[in-house]
Design a protein with these regions (language model features):
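Basic helix-turn-helix/winged-helix DNA-binding cores
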Residues: 1-59
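Conserved alpha-helix/loop element of class I SAM-dependent methyltransferases that forms part
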Residues: 208-227, 243
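Conserved class I S-adenosyl-L-methionine
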Residues: 226-238
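Class I SAM-dependent methyltransferase SAM/SAH-binding core
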Residues: 231, 242-288
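A short acidic, Gly/Pro-enriched loop at the edge of an enzyme's catalytic core
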Residues: 288-300
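A short glycine-rich, Lys/Arg-flanked "PGG" loop and its adjoining helix->strand segment in the class I
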Residues: 315-329
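Conserved beta-strand signature within the Rossmann-like core of class I S-adenosyl-L-methionine
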Residues: 328-336
Length: 407
């Protein structure tokens, strides 16, 4: 029979059969351009399947076939070396089973620990009373007054901060909301968003995220973070904060700012399960309405916050936030840059300059940040469901910057 019929009878693909032919495990007769398979081919195939069921690899099966074909009629099954092939396979399988059992037991222990972790009660994360003096009105820069506060363990959980100018900042679940309150969407299940993000995002994009995130982490943890105020603009789901959380000193204040209350609630809930506890202040606000003192920020974390802002604004975000920064502050940034823009690009022409390296470097120079280290990624052609700003024909890359102003 021909190869198609032979494959159909044995429920094998033509590619698999051709592979067996290439290894000389099956040797059909060839007439012209076609192979023809007889009962000997069928017998060899059944033996291949039998040996595979015993755990032999195709190369090991080739060696067994040499015995079958070259020692025919010599009662080769009794040959000591032939038998040793089966004995070696058996011993190897025993070792693999033993190793798998050890791995299974370790995995069982990890699963047990994970279940215990899930049962751990959450610690309370609110606004520490000790940071109130740092909070000021984003409109007039005057001090804020706590009103109707619910306090637990020296942390404000609910209430509002008011200013004499009339501005109010609600405190909900330990999160300050400035300006319009971005209400939590009860139907948004962010618990599954991390796994969904991984599955829906291009591997090269994820690899770059990990590589640049590790680069930034190493820069930050080598700084003296004691008694420092860190401002993270666009904390999102907290990819960066969660990676450095345990590295933060107890007396370091980390301010996570995002427009999306859902993401802040998710991040807060995740960190509430972590030990030891760190001083994190969550603010839900537009970037231009962050209610903190001018010239109070020691370290700026801008992990694509400026780039995300630039999708909708022409002004350079770091320039807008500059009054908040100390004269000698550090900047740790990651910018999304475009190698090219397609004719149907989603980036409005007026906003494109902020996605070019020359503009970024010029703005950083204008802000008097001097480079300590920089990193530029390879080009990326795809993002994914959550990084859908790319269109066909466009390529992006990331530029990471670590620098300082010297006052």
């Amino acid at each position: 029979m021909k190869i198609g019929k032979f494959g159909e009878v044995n429920n094998l693909s033509i590619d698999t059969i051709r592979h067996y032919i290439d290894l000389s495990l099956i040797i059909p007769e060839k007439k012209g351009a076609h192979y023809f398979f007889d009962e000997y081919c069928q017998s060899d195939l059944e033996l291949i399947i039998h040996y595979k069921d015993l755990g032999f690899s195709l190369n090991e099966i080739k060696e067994l076939f040499f015995y079958k074909n070259l020692a025919k009629s010599m009662n080769y099954e009794k040959d000591i070396f032939y038998q040793s092939l089966f004995k070696l396979k058996y011993d190897k399988m025993e070792q693999e089973i033993e190793l798998l059992e050890k791995k299974r037991d370790k995995l069982k222990g990890v699963l047990h620990d994970l279940l215990l972790t899930n049962e751990t009660s959450n610690t309370i994360i609110g606004i520490e009373l000790s940071v109130l003096h740092l909070l000021t009105c984003s409109k007039c820069s005057k001090k804020l007054i706590l009103q109707d506060g619910i306090i637990n363990n020296n942390q404000i959980i609910e209430g509002k901060l008011i200013c004499n100018c009339g501005e109010e900042y609600m405190i909900t679940s330990g999160i300050i909301s400035a300006g319009k309150l971005f209400k939590a969407n009860e139907q948004t299940l962010l618990e599954n968003i991390i796994s969904d993000y991984i599955h829906e995002t291009d591997n090269a994009y994820l690899e770059n995220m990990h590589r640049e995130g590790e680069w930034a982490k190493k820069k930050l943890i080598h700084l003296d973070l004691n008694n420092k105020l860190i401002l993270d603009i666009g904390s999102g789901l907290g990819f960066f904060l969660r990676s450095i959380y345990e590295e933060l000193p107890e007396d370091c204040l980390y301010i996570a700012v995002d427009r999306d209350l859902n993401k802040l609630l998710f991040l807060k809930d995740v960190l509430a399960r972590r030990n030891p506890k760190r001083n994190i202040l969550f603010i839900c606000a537009d970037f231009l309405n962050i209610p903190i003192q001018n010239r109070s920020v020691d370290i700026v974390i801008d992990h694509s916050g400026t780039s995300n802002y630039s999708f909708e604004h022409e002004n350079f975000l770091l320039h807008e936030l500059n009054p908040l920064f100390k004269s000698n502050c550090y900047l740790l940034s990651l910018f999304i840059l475009f190698k090219n823009f397609s004719s149907n690009s989603q980036i409005t022409i007026n906003f494109r300059a902020n996605f070019t390296l020359s503009k970024i470097k010029k703005e950083l120079q204008n802000l008097q940040f001097q480079s300590i280290d920089e990193s530029t990624s390879n080009y990326l052609k795809r993002g994914g469901k959550y990084e859908d700003f790319l269109v066909q024909g466009e390529e992006i890359y990331t530029y990471s910057f670590f620098g300082k102003r010297w006052g």
